[in-house]
């Protein structure tokens, strides 16, 4: 029997460039004084996201582990999550008292989902720059994730996207499932995500 605490595992997915790594940096910096955190990043051929988070000082370097998937990023979080599961276990054993581990997927499409063996909760990140039509395109990330983030609201005027249309379509596609707009440059929407993690992840129990 494992003699370490089993942390909450939160999968963070979304297309390339949507802001997954920026979200993790913001969440880590906002939560690290209150909770014991770690991060597993996924990249196909490099450990670029691990490097970005480390250089940004999101957490201590040994709390951030990069996984090189060497293939489809979807496979590494769904069909064969063994490398990620091993990384989660290694971090859990190393620190013993982790409250939460974020698992960031490599950039993927709207159909990407996390194996329930790997993630207890899932956050899916899209961004306004992809166009206001993205929420109504659906896909498991949009409709089934535990929390949806629509990032880069500050870009809406520059790409001709209506936040009102995106809000309407998102509410229609998600029903009662929670979501928020974010502008991570200034921290807009971050507290709502943290509140969700604390509530649904039972971090404060």
From Swiss-Prot:
| Gene Ontology BP annotations | urea catabolic process
What is this protein identified as?
Urease accessory protein UreG
**What InterPro entries would the database entry show?**
CobW/HypB/UreG_nucleotide-bd, P-loop_NTPase, UreG
Q: How does it assemble?
A: Homodimer. UreD, UreF and UreG form a complex that acts as a GTP-hydrolysis-dependent molecular chaperone, activating the urease apoprotein by helping to assemble the nickel containing metallocenter of UreC. The UreE protein probably delivers the nickel.
Q: What does this protein do?
A: Facilitates the functional incorporation of the urease nickel metallocenter. This process requires GTP hydrolysis, probably effectuated by UreG.
Disulfide bonding pattern of the chain: none
The family line of this record is: Belongs to the SIMIBI class G3E GTPase family. UreG subfamily.
**Which PANTHER family would you find in this protein's record?**
UREASE ACCESSORY PROTEIN G
User: Which GO MF terms does the UniProt record name?
Assistant: GTP binding; GTPase activity; nickel cation binding
Species whose genome carries this gene: Enterobacter sp. (strain 638)
Q: Where in the cell is it found?
A: Cytoplasm
- Amino-acid positions noted as binding GTP in the UniProt annotation, renumbered to this chain: 14-21
Q: Keyword annotations for this protein?
A: Chaperone, Cytoplasm, GTP-binding, Nickel insertion, Nucleotide-binding
Out of the domains of life, which is the source? Answer: Bacteria
Q: Cellular component terms, GO, for this chain's entry?
A: cytoplasm
**Which gene carries the instructions for this protein?**
ureG
């Amino acid at each position: 029997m494992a003699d370490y605490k089993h942390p909450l595992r939160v999968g963070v997915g979304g297309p390339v460039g949507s802001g997954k790594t920026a979200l993790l940096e913001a969440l880590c910096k906002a939560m690290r004084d209150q909770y014991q955190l770690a991060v597993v990043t996924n990249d196909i051929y490099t450990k670029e996201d691990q490097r970005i988070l480390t250089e940004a000082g999101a957490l201590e370097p040994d709390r951030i582990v990069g996984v090189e998937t060497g293939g489809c990023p979807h496979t590494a979080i769904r069909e064969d999550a063994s490398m990620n599961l091993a990384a989660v276990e290694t971090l859990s054993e190393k620190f013993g008292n982790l409250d939460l581990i974020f698992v960031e997927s490599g950039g993927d499409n709207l159909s990407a989902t996390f194996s329930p063996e790997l993630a207890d909760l899932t956050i899916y990140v899209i961004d306004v720059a992809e166009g206001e039509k993205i929420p109504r395109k659906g896909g498991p990330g949009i409709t089934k994730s535990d929390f949806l983030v629509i990032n880069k609201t500050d870009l809406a005027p520059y790409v001709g996207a209506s936040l009102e249309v995106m809000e309407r379509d998102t509410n229609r596609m998600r029903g009662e499932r929670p979501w928020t707009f974010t502008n991570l440059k200034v921290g807009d929407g971050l507290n709502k995500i943290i509140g969700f993690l604390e509530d649904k992840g039972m971090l404060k129990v």
